[in-house]
Amino acid sequence: MAGPGEYFAIGAYVSCRTCQETRLQGEVVAFDYPSKMLALKCPSSSGKANHADILLLNLDYVSDVEVINERTQTPPPLASLNITKLASRARLEKEEKLSQAYAISAGVSLDGQQLFQTIHKTIKDCKWQEKNIVVMDEVVISPPYQVENCKGKEGRALTHVCKIVEKHFRDVENQKGVQRNPVAQSQKETSTSS
């Protein structure tokens, strides 16, 4: 780790070992000495070209820190940030977390919470009203959150929401079937080999 008065230069290449014994290597994009936080730009974990992962490391929790290559030229100017877009993303994330917290505190079943998340991926205009899911202020889905529990004016909105609910529970059933199959398959193999 950088000693008192030592800093990591922006653009330097650094290698370190995390507390989970993972070796990381990347380019320094920021370093804050008082908080001992180091931001490294590493190759993208998705493998996509022209993408990178930015990792924030607390130097109190890493070891074997070594500078592989010091930056010899002046670093490029920092990229501009779209503050409006970031604020909007943060606001939406906060609203989503508050909605999840509300559902949990209201005692909504796990099926209801999962259905809400599925609907919210397609239709952002959905909210909780006690234990009911309200979609586009037109469709109300009450517990136990099945297709027959969808109420609203006949029309495209109700039909669309019913299709989403139907597909959600069909996908859940298929997922349960996939999880059960390996066990059933191994039991068949055991009984036929005996």
UniProtKB/Swiss-Prot annotation:
Pfam families: AD (PF09793), LSM12_LSM (PF21166). Residues 1-71 form the Sm domain. It comes from the Eukaryota. CDD domains: LSm12_N. The keyword Cytoplasm applies. Transmembrane segments: none annotated. One of its GO terms (molecular function) is RNA binding. The keyword Cytoplasm applies. GO terms for cellular component: cytoplasm. Residues 79-173 form the AD domain. Its main location: cytoplasm. Residues 176-194 have a biased composition (Polar residues). Disulfide bonds: none annotated. It is found in: Cytoplasm. Keywords: Cytoplasm. Residues 175-194 are annotated as: Disordered. Nicotinic acid adenine dinucleotide phosphate (NAADP) binding protein. Belongs to the LSM12 family. PANTHER family: LSM12 HOMOLOG. This is Protein LSM12. It comes from Xenopus laevis. The gene is lsm12.
